[in-house]
């Protein structure tokens, strides 16, 4: 459109100038005509957002995402231009939405089941048209999603409760593995070990080196976050992305070895029912020709990294909030004593833990770790009166929406925000619709299991009156605590009247 307007046949400024106009006035008239064209071009879009400005606007907006991080840039632009606005990422029109009605439209329609991101970046991390998380091939995504849904619901979810409780107990008995010379325990690493061990037991069932793989998962996530929206020119300079390639290769090689061991175990098993799980189902699908070896490896990789990545940090944030709000801890402990008592938590207890559930929901609303969803329009559409063309990128700024609509005290952490049932359109920590998080049900149950099991044994305190609000964070692909910052300490005091005191911290 803009190039057409610059075509002299379309918009010839000079033919409107009288022959008597001095030659010296021609440059001024040309500049005025050019400014008029730019203004007309910018006003042609009905969606609020920064101007195109001969291509400078797209460069600036993409640069801001690279500089600030995806989450922070989304908050900046929504605050600047409103809850439905337009920018550009990699030269592609991108909508940033923090309006509940628009989010519901996007989430519930199959027109938006595709993801977006740098093709080269996704290829580097193995997610381009592969796996489930950022797979932008709708056909393959539909093929692999049922495997995840089967593993993460039904019998798998029920079995998870017992497996997770046992893993927590074992890791609390081996705190020395994540304890430094000063006697402090790295809480996030502890959570990552518990999550990885639980996931491995449920979905793969092959012995592994937890410490080694946890570090490799962090390297993989850092590469994923760094490469997701990098411009193509970045990948033409090998030394810029070589370290990310190495991090990805380290984890993928480790997973390939584990999956090969699983294949051998399945082949030599006398009774297949003894080794039936998520990985086995994928291996059988590969043998039938439904999936490739690469598909199988990537799906297992993504299943193993999901909980150690986001849920570990989410649980750490929840522990900080419990330490900051002792009245919340008191209410939770009262409910645990009433519902669970002295025994271990069981699957039947989960639905009765209403205070724990409200606490989890309020934590996910107030300080979400995953606060945005990235989609792409597969066909032309209209959202809340705005035209959306096929191929348009969309970012749903869920974290901002949770603080703008419905809740009585949106900027405070209080369980009052969930005293009444919240309509689903106003609270979507896991999304809904055809591309909602496959693990949203098991994640909620797992968080209840971890909190109940830990809080039955320990009170939670923080040193130096630290609080989550003023802790350094990086809000990019997801919101993570800045692990390069000074130490933030949490104390776990044994719940019984004993002199035992255990301090736990995360190196921030």
From Swiss-Prot:
Pfam families: p450 (PF00067). Gene3D superfamilies: Cytochrome P450 (1.10.630.10). Its EC number is 1.14.14.14. It is found in: Membrane. CDD domains: CYP19A1. One of its GO terms (cellular component) is endoplasmic reticulum. PROSITE patterns: CYTOCHROME_P450. SUPFAM superfamilies: Cytochrome P450 (SSF48264). Heme binds at residue 437. GO terms for molecular function: aromatase activity; heme binding; iron ion binding; oxidoreductase activity, acting on paired donors, with incorporation or reduction of molecular oxygen, reduced flavin or flavoprotein as one donor, and incorporation of one atom of oxygen. It is a peripheral membrane protein. The keyword Transport does not apply. It catalyses: testosterone + 3 reduced [NADPH--hemoprotein reductase] + 3 O2 = 17beta-estradiol + formate + 3 oxidized [NADPH--hemoprotein reductase] + 4 H2O + 4 H(+); androst-4-ene-3,17-dione + 3 reduced [NADPH--hemoprotein reductase] + 3 O2 = estrone + formate + 3 oxidized [NADPH--hemoprotein reductase] + 4 H2O + 4 H(+). Its cofactor is heme. GO terms for biological process: adrenal gland development; androgen catabolic process; androgen metabolic process; bile acid metabolic process; biphenyl metabolic process; bone development; C21-steroid hormone metabolic process; calcineurin-mediated signaling. Transmembrane segments: none annotated. Belongs to the cytochrome P450 family. Catalyzes the formation of aromatic C18 estrogens from C19 androgens. This is Aromatase.
